[in-house]
Amino acid sequence: MGSPFFILSNKGESQIIVTKSSPILVPKVLFDARHIEDYLRLQYDVSKAGHILQDEIEDYISVSYLDKTENDCLTQLEPRYYQHITTFLYNILHRVIANKAANCLCLSIQDECIHFFLEKDNRLLLVNDIAITSDYDILYHALNILNQYGVDPDDCVVYLHNGNDTLAELLSEYTDVTLLKLT
């Protein structure tokens, strides 16, 4: 497995994009910062957590973390701003792309993992990640997610980050595909 993060630098600030396991989404109306570690414990062992990340994504607070070793190697970067890859791409779609599709599946491939979120009628329905083995594996999961949430592939755009041409071509046989490049 590769690095659990990558770094974007801009005007003296380092933006650290975390690409490890999916964040926990807590509805804003229920979120209490005093219980942030409890939220993470629902799904993860946080005994080695070094830095806890908290972001807003639609009506939710996204909570994830870097372990102590990962965090220690980043302490040399000042100032720094942490964000999970899912939140980062969500913000790009909502702030940068003028005519974002109402029904969309955003896929970000990081090593053997794909991070994704699904929106239907401009409402966030799902944030998760899946271990992957091939482009066909990604195609299967993408179509399965759309089917499970009642999203017609003909009425959906897949926003693809870090995908290859073969994957884009496979997906485009079923739905519209837009490549997201961060450079």
Show the residue positions of the predicted features:
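Hydrophobic/aromatic-enriched cytosolic interaction surfaces used to assemble or bind macromolecules
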Residues: 1-183
